[in-house]
């Protein structure tokens, strides 16, 4: 398996996951695929989300010959993973909200989950709460507006602090001590969240856990390939110049100059608009 790692999201949120994976596997090549034409996913019907995501991801997997797919979107992960795993012959990794570690770390036994309206309403999320946080008070907060604030920041536009404060006011008033960032967009505005909520609220996301999972799936294969071929392993099966892989981005709607700068800041060397089926 020598193709790139395909990281998928509705927008720029998956960049936070991409960054964590790249820390673990810097020599791998990557394709960052984002469906910005249909952003935000939290407002889509389940059937529309499943159909669109599966078609887009499968199309791009074939195009770039990806060796693994990371669905770096909580909303999509709650719905599309079973379908993708039926359609594809390569590993598919999804995002699980960090509810289990949040429950373990909470001293007050009062945690919150901040995600899109779709994620907080799904049985999948409520199942995680029942399984891992029965001994905690768990407050659910759904916001698509916060997704768009993160997108604005990525486009180099100022964050609307008044709007941010209005969204976060119920969280601050709840007196919880651990907040799960149940949308991959939200680590992009972690600094703003921390500034408003204060140091007493611990913010948790799943980026590092996803990176560990991807590495566990790829590293044994890379090691086995190196041992059987007699070659030297330099951190990944598809190494770039001096052990650093390249990242290509693909998107479904034209991007702004500001967002292009953000992509470059994440090490993305080139990008292109793709036509969906």
UniProtKB/Swiss-Prot annotation:
GO terms for biological process: cell wall organization; peptidoglycan biosynthetic process; regulation of cell shape. Disulfide bonds: none annotated. Keywords: Cell shape, Cell wall biogenesis/degradation, Isomerase, Peptidoglycan synthesis. GO terms for molecular function: glutamate racemase activity. It comes from the Bacteria. Transmembrane segments: none annotated. SUPFAM superfamilies: Aspartate/glutamate racemase. It is an enzyme of class 5 (isomerase). Pfam families: Asp_Glu_race. Substrate binds at residues 9-10, 41-42, 74-75, 184-185. It catalyses: L-glutamate = D-glutamate. The keyword Isomerase applies. The active site is at residues 73, 183. InterPro entries: Asp/Glu/hydantoin_racemase (IPR015942), Asp/Glu_race (IPR001920), Asp/Glu_racemase_AS_1 (IPR018187), Asp/Glu_racemase_AS_2 (IPR033134), Glu_race (IPR004391). This is Glutamate racemase. It comes from Shewanella denitrificans (strain OS217 / ATCC BAA-1090 / DSM 15013). The lineage of its organism: Bacteria, Pseudomonadati, Pseudomonadota, Gammaproteobacteria, Alteromonadales.
